[in-house]
């Protein structure tokens, strides 16, 4: 079975991502996405945006509320199969290229999702959509995305928050514990691939 799981790191929330583009050129580990990981069940690949190392302002509603030292990818444990980008535009282009390949080949993509008002909120996907729109990239590549409700996982404590593979680990745990939503999603994906 062919499918891809995706995890986005370094993004605080969708609102802050919007503020990043509204306020200008500031780079801040808690404001913009800086790493995305792709996992196909065997290999983990990542694309990292190389952030400046000096302190950067933290914005809230357009006002500087503090400063932070930005992450540099060398300071963080990353997968071996890693592409390092010089800026967010280059990062976006590479992430888009991966997603387009998955869409063209009908390979399902799994993101984490969170329940909000009885609907699943695709937090990471929404951040990517904001970034893609900023750089005039076709957001239809995100149409292949499916979601896993991570909040309903009874074994959530086994997932290390902020790790590169927390969503992939969730999928593994879900299968291991025969979680119905995970098992049914995998079954549906398998059937859809057979039909291609």
Model features per residue range: what roles?
Residues 1, 63-66, 194-196:
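Short intrinsically disordered terminal tails
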Residues 22-26, 80-86, 168-172:
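Surface-exposed cleft-lining segments at the edges of enzyme active sites
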Residues 14-16, 131, 188:
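Active-site-proximal flexible loops/turns
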Residues 110-113, 119-122, 151-196:
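Acidic, Mg2+-coordinating catalytic module of metal-dependent nucleases/exonucleases
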Residues 1-38:
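Entry/capping segment at the start of metal-dependent catalytic domains
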Residues 7-9, 124, 181:
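Acidic active-site catalytic centers that drive phospho-/nucleotidyl reactions
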Residues 44-153:
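Conserved DEDDh/DEDDy metal-dependent 3′-5′ exonuclease domain
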